[in-house]
Amino acid sequence: MGKRRRGKQEIDNLTKKQKKHLKEFGEQHPFHDKVVERPEKTQILRLPDSPQRPEPDSEDDSDAEQPSAYQKLLSTMIQGDEDDVESEDEESEEEDNEEEAEVEGDSEEEVEDTDEEDGNDAEEVLEDKVEETSDKLQKKHPEKTNGDVEENEEAEMEGEFTDKKNEAAFCLETNMPAEGEENTAQQEQDEDMFVKHQEIELSEEEVGRISQGSKVKTQVKWAKLGVLQCMCPLERFPAIGQASSAPLPPIHKTLEANWHLLNLPFGAATDVTELQKEMLGLMGTYRDLYLANLSPLKEAKEVRSAYCLHALNHVLKANSRVLRNNAKLKESKNGDEDFRDQGLTRPKVLILVPFRDGALRVVQTFMTLLEPKGKKTDASNKKRFKEEYGEETDEKPPNLQRPDDYHAVFSGNIDDHFRIGMSILRHSMRLYAPFYSSDIIIASPLGLRTVLGAEGEKKRDHDFLSSIELLIVDQADVFLMQNWEHLLHVLEHLNLQPLDSHGVDFSRVRMWNLNNWAAYYRQTLVFSAIQEPQITNILTKHCHNYRGQVCSKTIPKIGSICQVLVQLPHVFQMFHSDSFMDQDARFQFFVDKILPQYRDSVMSHTFIYVPSYFDFVRLRNYLKKEDVSFANISEYSQRSEVSRARHYFQKGEKQFLLFSERFHFYKRYTIKGIHNLIFYGLPTYPHFYSEVCNMLQAGVREGGASVSFTCTALYSRYDVHRLAAITGADRAAQMLQSKKTTHLFITGEEKST
């Protein structure tokens, strides 16, 4: 214990300057070195009156000193990035204090560890500190351990771990096909849509027609996918027919053994389902696809497995073609053969998922599909990946009572800031590959946004998205609940002309990539739990596939209003609006027609549900201005603010409670004390309507049975999808076509009328 206290005391006695130096360089400045009494090894030299003794605040003389072994070690890690070190020296006083606290805490732990093992002096404490500092530097700047990788490539993953060891093993330019793999070219027959799609040549006239957005629309009905709307921009690529006319695409030889085990990762039946067969048939045509109304409890897992197979099949075919052409070029004597089989950058597939758990499940599906017979998939950095993307056992409180769909969406690790690159070669997978060496990038919109940056920023990079051939947007509805602008920002940076060549061999680049036509060849797959105009707008504005688009148009016949259990009159009031984005009309209708009815003190306990946060802020400011008694709860409210608002509203001390939809999405609290319910806008998720209405049961259970409840919902003709999901397709059609602007439904003991 004495040695431990002595080591801790030495750290505590350091000045702030000394601690900062220890933090940055892993050892004390030579002036402050304390030599341990070891007469046989160390000579003690004291110079108390030396006129050349350096001042503690002076760093000029340190450069003249001969660098120690520790400094030489660190210099190899931070070589080429002196600017970053200098910028750290210019940090503010607050950051210095934070570093000081961090050094103290970390050093105390290191002292205890070294004393328990074999620490006899303060030098071992400093040695451990050097190793700790080196690890931190390597994690913060992994690119500095390999000077062969270009700076732009490293900037994308700054502050994150990237795999540098397996660069040569997964390099497409230097690898050759394995034995027996040369004959796999027979798979690439003219009937393979992958080959057709890659080799189609468009004319400038056809590109112009696609850009204009004119499309021929038709409808078909499939057994599982329901009603599908097909939009074709070019006549020579007609619309799809019935499900039987879209057979399963050819599967790459690497996947032949396991592709039928598509549903094995989530413990379902091993056979491919009918839904997956229809999806694979559609995706194999390389048309854009938008499927909505996919329940996270039922179809979500099947959908994930299907698009993982399609993405992996696409990457393996593309890489196999490159490897075969490498062998042909090597055998060619004159070298006159021309093989255009690549894009301007290597990444081919971009998969956007909202949470880390989604990325984990995608990678697990990839591993299952790539697994050779009798062996496990060779995946580098698998342990690190499971640690960073897996769920910690103590993250969620026990006995959390939430709906089943909530647990399905928020299962596992729900961190929404991540990005990871993957390289695929035969049965092997390289996790944490640098983006410019990756075949597949799995990320959240927020994770990519921090790399892409914004206009005018110094550190930004989007070249790795220049040659994306397959874009997959899974759980698009969840992105609406996060930040939709991040997703749009990513879409705006797809298939742009790169600013740097990144070492590409232009003789191998496809002509449509050189012509900046990659956007017309990119396939986009969008999957969502709801029908929403903002999601549909993705395909309208950001997708220009020359093969056209297929969108699901199935509307539920039975609405979520049938799931309301409490006896409640539902009044739907329609207001006139000129466009989907016209929020002024909704606000004026609410202020002029709805709110005055509830200003009377008799109409207390009024709950206002607001889907849009912008509308939430607008209403909050208006209620403050009008001096209305209200409380508010949003996704940005602190826990104490939420508790006070719920208490004041339940006790009647606040007449109104302003409630944002995103808070309900992330928390699913039951609000007690609701007597009057106002939907400022129809909920984004139809089951939210019934969930909020059933909150009135909480008041009934606590003795409020004698209270008469009311419910009012506002809608316009642009809310057709939300209205149909709540009231049902037939009733929604009648309401929109009727000359009346008010419609009444009764739920509870009586049937809805």
UniProtKB/Swiss-Prot annotation:
The modification Phosphoserine is found at residues 50, 58, 62, 87, 92. Mainly expressed in digestive organs at the later stage of organogenesis. Expressed in liver, gut and exocrine pancreas, but not in the islets. Pfam families: Utp25_C, UTP25_NTPase-like. Residues 1-189, 566-627 are annotated as: Promotes p53/TP53 degradation. Coiled coil: none annotated. Keywords: Developmental protein, Nucleus, Phosphoprotein. One of its GO terms (biological process) is organ growth. One of its GO terms (molecular function) is rRNA binding. Belongs to the UTP25 family. This is U3 small nucleolar RNA-associated protein 25 homolog. It comes from Danio rerio.
